[in-house]
Amino acid sequence: MKKVIILGSTGSIGTQTLDVIKNFRENFEIVGLTAYNNVELLSKQIREFNPKVVAVKDEDKANQLRENLKKNVEILTGSKGLQEIVKYDADLVVVAVEGIAGLIPTVTAIQMGKDIALANKEVLVTAGQIVMDLVKKKDISLLPVDSEHSAILQCLRGNDKKEVSRLILTASGGPFRGKKKEDLRKVTVNEALNHPNWKMGKKITIDSATLMNKGFEVIEAKWLFDISEDKIDVIVHPQSIIHSMVEYIDGSVIAQLATADMRIPIHYALNYPTRNYINGMNFLDFSLTTQLTFEKPDLETFRCLSLAYEALKIGGTMTTVLNAADEIAVSLFLNKKIEFLQIAEIIEESMKEHNNIQNPTLDDIINVDEEVKEKIAKKYMR
């Protein structure tokens, strides 16, 4: 039986992870769960899965949780709680918390020799070199939960990495595919949150609308698969049936296809390298799949993807700046403080102003993250 800790169990990926685990109760034991604010849902999860330990935002949330529960469970709090919970006896830590908050707990879990199922983008975007060096040193598995990276992992299995010509990440194009800059000047938050294919959290949905999500995935792919950025391409595939592809040096292309359901890559990360039948899963019906189309991304309109490639090429703390500026800019947009196109403008401005640190420590990364966010917040949150 695999012992599992889920960081961010009340979010989109966390709830779907527990949904998958419900199908395989005999294979998994939930050791720990964490939530930020959603004490009500966490209470239900505790009753259903009986974890030994949980962590919440602060002591107020901990007190709310104690009032909700009749059972005795250890409750940790704050960022220290996230770091402490991964030290408990477990085989796998699912990192589904959003933001830079996931970085130190992930590093701590790796140092403890635990395998990682990674759904947090910031970990590799900001500290890819540090994290992957540690993964190799500790000889643990770091498995992607993203559908695109899971697809690439599956397409690479059984093949020699030296034979890879390029990785091809697919993008749906988001709700504004085909639009030009002029069309996007006055788009609303609701329009940007209306993703055509995937049901996700608000932050990642906006990142999909700007194509920054795909930019983050390019950065993650470099570190996950140890490949240079000039061998990672992005293609827009509106149907979201092909989740990514690997092209080999003989011209062959291997693709992974599936319905747009996050439970598939979650299941693969939980059970790797085996596969099991998932109850309630919709299988592809090729008789209903009338076409698979592809187009180049519009880098002029969707500047965020270009900025991600640029940050990756520069390296060092520039990817931390990219991530921090995006996080604040998206928050400003969601709170109707800025317009949609200003997201890319704020990120580009932050990158231009940054004095890059080429070989950063974890402290450098966390400090740069805080500095960038504070600077943008001061300027726009008046």
UniProtKB/Swiss-Prot annotation:
Protein name: 1-deoxy-D-xylulose 5-phosphate reductoisomerase
Gene3D superfamilies: 1.10.1740.10, NAD(P)-binding Rossmann-like Domain (3.40.50.720)
Membership in a protein family: Belongs to the DXR family.
Keywords: Isoprene biosynthesis, Manganese, Metal-binding, NADP, Oxidoreductase
Pathway: Isoprenoid biosynthesis; isopentenyl diphosphate biosynthesis via DXP pathway; isopentenyl diphosphate from 1-deoxy-D-xylulose 5-phosphate: step 1/6
Top class in the EC scheme: oxidoreductase
Top-level taxonomy: Bacteria, Bacillati, Bacillota, Clostridia, Thermoanaerobacterales
GO BP term, example: isopentenyl diphosphate biosynthetic process, methylerythritol 4-phosphate pathway involved in terpenoid biosynthetic process
MF terms (GO), sorted A to Z: 1-deoxy-D-xylulose-5-phosphate reductoisomerase activity; manganese ion binding; NADPH binding
Annotated binding of Mn(2+), by residue: D146, E148, E217
EC numbers for this chain: 1.1.1.267
Function: Catalyzes the NADPH-dependent rearrangement and reduction of 1-deoxy-D-xylulose-5-phosphate (DXP) to 2-C-methyl-D-erythritol 4-phosphate (MEP).
Binding site for 1-deoxy-D-xylulose 5-phosphate: K121, S147, E148, S172, H195, S208, N213, K214, E217
Catalysed reactions listed for this entry: 2-C-methyl-D-erythritol 4-phosphate + NADP(+) = 1-deoxy-D-xylulose 5-phosphate + NADPH + H(+)
Disulfide bonds: none
Cofactor: Mg(2+); Mn(2+)
Source organism: Thermoanaerobacter sp. (strain X514)
Binding site for NADPH: T10, G11, S12, I13, N38, N120, E122, G201
